[in-house]
Amino acid sequence: MHSVRTSTTSTSSMVSSTMHPFDAFNAPQPYQQHHPPRWNIHNPHFSQTNGHSIQKTPSMIKLHSSEGTVPTTNGADTLHQRNMEEKIISAPLHYITGLPGKDIRGKLISAFNEWFRIPDEQLEIIKRVVGLLHVASLLIDDIEDSSKLRRGFPVAHSIFGIPQTINSANYAYFQAQSEVLKLRNCNAAFTIFTEELLRLHRGQGMDLYWRDSLTCPTEEEYLDMVANKTGGLFRLAIKLIQLESDVEDDCVPLVDLLGIIFQIRDDYQNLQNEQYAKNKGFAEDITEGKFSYPIVHSIRSGAANCSSGSSELMNILRQKTDDEAVKRYTICILEKTGSFEYTRRKLTELMAAARAMLAEFGSAEAAGLGGILDFLELKE
């Protein structure tokens, strides 16, 4: 023990207060163990450098160690590796984009550009941004909603697993962010991108909270949530287009209205449309326990009239049932409370307001948007 203390004291005296800090690393260290170099010499073609050797081949560089060969690929192999990784990471995204769909958002962007007339290069960037965010949101929504089908096919996480699907969706968010930085007014575009994604997640958060806490929102609260959630990508697209355009018209109010129309129409079709049932499953919103627009109306109107249907609806939503008989009974409750009729009237009212807004612009270039509104009309 005495000799140990002596050795330590001796070393300390060599690293004096006047020594440059980095010189301390060169001072003798107590109990320092010397090991042979980690990398062994196997290549006769190169001279030794500090006990290391490197073997070079046309396709790769190999470092030989006691634990095996560690390859470091050259440029061509690195590119191939990156491409393979990209395919793996993006597989859930590519799966969803490969499913049949109407691309309503892409068509909407093209329709708005009929009068904003931004360059094709900028337009394609905006389409990629919105497309990536849309597909990412579908991947996450299907997980959060425990969905089984997407456009008539198994949801992505049923094929790739939940962790890989979440990672792929997150990857798409940052791919979209990198695309935004390619726009001419990239600083302002990045601010818009951030603001709208925050609004989208606030809306989604409230939708999930109401469902999981079994809290029925008011109609006003519901519409505010939809404006944030569903209107987010519509609004992001038009704000970026307006930012890149010399045309000074403000179409954000119209886009907000279109987002609400789109979501209420989707809620209605989830419970009433046979084709929707084939693509997503019969009355999936009931299985999810979601407070969709017709259900909010039925519960609120039933509570006001002291109807037993209101409490029955709440109990059914709590079950998150997949029983078709129970779901058909739920639809009967909605019919009795006039909730489907109320939803149709609301859509007619909103559609008229949207057409009036469109007419105010008085532009022949708005024909494409008129076609979008025609598509959104309910077909009974």
Swiss-Prot record:
Keywords annotated in UniProt: Magnesium, Metal-binding, Transferase
Give the GO molecular function terms: metal ion binding; prenyltransferase activity
Role summary: Geranylgeranyl pyrophosphate synthase; part of the cluster A that mediates the biosynthesis of chevalone E and its oxidized derivatives that possess a unique five-membered lactone ring and can synergistically enhance the cytotoxicity of doxorubicin (DOX) in breast cancer cells.
Q: Gene encoding it? A: cle6
Nucleus listed as a keyword = no
The residues listed in the UniProt record as binding Mg(2+) 3, with positions renumbered to this chain, are D266
Protein's recorded name: Geranylgeranyl pyrophosphate synthase cle6
Spell out the InterPro entries in the cross-references: Isoprenoid_synthase_dom_sf, Polyprenyl_synt, Polyprenyl_synt_CS
Comp. bias (Polar residues): 45-55
